[in-house]
Amino acid sequence: MATDVVPTAKLYEEHCASCHGAGRLGGIGPALLPENLGRLKREEAVAIIRDGRIASQMPGFRDKLSTEQITQLTGLCYAPLPQVPRWELADIRGSHVAHVKLGEKLSDKPVFKADLLNLFVVVEVGDHHATLLDGDRFVPILRFATRFALHGGPKFSPDGRYVYFGSRDGWVSKFDIYNLKYVAEIRAGINMRNIAVSSDGRYVLAGNYLPHTLVVLDASDLAPIKIIPVQDDAGKSSRVSAVYDAAPRRSFIAALKDIPEVWEIPYDAKAEPIYPGLVHDYRLGEALAAKGPFPVRRIRLDDYLDDFFFDQSYEHLIGAARNGKNGQVVSLIVGRKIADVDLPGLPHLGSGITWDYRGTPVLATPNLKEGTITVIDMKTWKTIKQIKTLGPGFFMRSHEDTPYAWADAMMSPASKDAIQVIDKRTLEPVRTLKPAPGKTAAHTEFTRDGKYALVSVWEMDGALVVYDAATLKEIKRLPMKKPSGKYNVYNKITRSSGTSH
């Protein structure tokens, strides 16, 4: 037995630790513990190590590891730690970092000149930095260090002054754009998925893979307010897939990984009471309303939702499971599934966008597994068209003031360098752009007015390439270190239909 343990540990250190953490607690990749692998069967884990995983861009190791070695590593992933790390309120409070001294007053006027609503925050994952970019002149204002492995996209305060970052290893950071400096940081978890900022600017919600919690923070200084354990009525806990702000509903939405539920968490003090059980008549006292701030409304479903998308009203969410064959449409008004949606392959709903097509609102979503973009009528929830593309893609973006939608094929080995421009009026591709032939091109974002589109060359020696959104000609190119995403202040805080929220 002893001779078995040592080589397995060395295999993990050599092939896995750089992404999944030295103690299997997560890093760029998720934590590899039995508590976090509840839905994954061992034979499926073997296949993932051998062949890779499309959705997470994890490579396969069939050429580097033998069948026996893959089996060894699988066994390690399912082996419990002597003690599962805890991250409780005292730990969160103890991690707090205040970058603004007590009594220090930050200026309410920006220390630079630019259109404050046409700024971009560009995340450069190559060396863990971010660049604040002037969206009129396409000139960097400041490049600054971030925490390790940011994930989920930065989120802005409602006025666009502050940007909040979330990292894979649990850190939440608040940065003052006006003063070009960090305000505060705190570690909300050990392995975190993403964060959301409330529409009133008062709260930040962090969703964790490890521990299985949601953490509510005060947006002003990131002080912890509440930890919400994530578990069903039977006590089964779950990782959090993602958290979102449903601004028109003044609530947070949490997608859960291991239990078939979606949670709605109101942050409005005037919200209607939430009754956990079945209530026929509240006067009879059949159920008591959940007490305290941030009550949980559980929406129970037939299947898991790993990935989902909201309509512009935030009355419906469209979700899909990674191993499912169809999507589900869930009404947040009535709290249940109201329709099934035909979504073959592996749709990436988190990158879906909407627009008006011949008088009908439509949803378009790329696919991580197939070279298709699915276009769905959002009145009937029927598929209008499957647009054939050059290969599986991750991101799709547009803007209200452009007739085009831009889609990458970054999951395709043969076409990873291509961006396809699709006419929203005809649902047909009209142009293919290759910002850097042979290098990965991904993640388009538009300027505030929709006149320019910014595309990432997603490599260590990468670049941000600016295109005229009408002529599709290159305007400018800025060298950057693997710019994974760029986020326009105005488009984000106004919840543009052409970008993710």
Positions of PLM-derived features:
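Short metal-coordination and nucleic-acid-contact micro-motifs, chiefly zinc-binding Cys/His arrays
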Residues: 12
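Extracytoplasmic electron-transfer domains, predominantly the class I c-type cytochrome c fold
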Residues: 18, 23-27, 32-82
